[in-house]
């Protein structure tokens, strides 16, 4: 469920959406009934459209929850499959065979920094902080159940800053 929520959070963050519809949930593989268990993560609100019917509209309980889950999704996708969701060309899987894991992580971080800098309203700033924080060794230990490989180091973070 965490991976699906992360995918939803990332897709909606990229679109700049704070609210989303039931169809967005199903596109990310989230069953509404099963998701009700996670009612502390996102809430259902009702929005009346044209006065004819009520359409179910959802949002995360706080924007920072959406940004964290989006960063977690990007990080896990990259670590587990080598795909850089922030790359325009989506060729990270080819690059992963050419470079070491540390250089790839640097590439992911650089893509995130570039995207955040291109944002006119700074909507990716906290996402970037979460993404960089997920690569810290202390957090890798906490995420080991979700990660396939955890060979990251502090040197990668220093290279990103350079």
Segments and roles (model prediction):
Residues 1-162:
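Leucine-enriched alpha-helical scaffold segments used for protein-protein interaction
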């Amino acid at each position: 469920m965490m991976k699906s929520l992360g995918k939803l959070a990332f897709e909606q963050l990229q679109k700049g959406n704070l609210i989303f519809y039931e169809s967005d949930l199903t596109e990310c593989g989230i069953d509404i009934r099963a998701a009700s268990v996670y009612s502390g993560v996102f809430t259902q609100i009702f929005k009346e459209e044209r006065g004819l019917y009520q359409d179910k509209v959802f949002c995360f309980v706080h924007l920072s929850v959406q940004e964290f889950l989006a960063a977690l999704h990007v990080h896990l996708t990259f670590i587990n499959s080598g795909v850089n969701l922030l790359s325009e060309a989506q060729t990270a899987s080819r690059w992963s065979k050419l470079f070491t894991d540390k250089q790839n992580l640097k590439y992911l971080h650089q893509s995130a920094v570039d995207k955040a800098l291109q944002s006119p309203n700074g909507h990716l700033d906290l996402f970037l902080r979460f993404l960089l924080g997920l690569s810290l060794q202390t957090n890798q230990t906490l995420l080991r159940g979700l990660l396939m490989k955890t060979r990251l180091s502090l040197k990668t973070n220093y290279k990103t800053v350079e």
